[in-house]
Amino acid sequence: HNELPFLYGGDNWPYDAMCERQRRKGVYASQYLTPDRTARQMAALAVRYFDNDSRVVDACCGTGQLTRALILEGVHPSAILGFDTDAELVDLYARFYSEAAALRMQFREIDFRCENVIANPPFEIAECVSFLQWLSCTQHSGDRAVLLLPYGFIDKPCPKSVQETMRHFIVRHRTPMQEPFARTNCRAEIVVVERA
């Protein structure tokens, strides 16, 4: 819209601005920002694996990097609901994607069925396990999720809660993330799971 007070040559200002914020303040609350190519790959998998008649939930949505990719893949914004705990990010999300529903909530507070989930959830072990436990409670058999998880997380033997939770899911697809996160050295993989 040419409304920035400086010359910007990129095509994804929200992502670039959040990367700059991380550069200045560091990673906060396990917010590893989903890079463009990874977001597009996840969105393509979502379109391939999801039930097209059901809403898509962008869990831990941040500024909407995954929602942006879903829209580019042809998902209508009105079919998307994004939520995050960070009020500033949810406000930005609501401004960028006014046709999508936006909620400021923790995933633990979401108690409705989420048939189709796309997410880059928190990477700390306890938080990631909690996210997967929440997912197993809000999904029914056959529901699916496309997740960006720490590399090898779903194979971890310890803590036991990882394998106990993963028993609720069938892994349909997994592939290593092909590009690095900005400002972090964490490795990740894209995992498509189906609720057993």
Sequence positions of predicted segments:
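Class I S-adenosyl-L-methionine-dependent methyltransferase catalytic core
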Residues: H1-A196
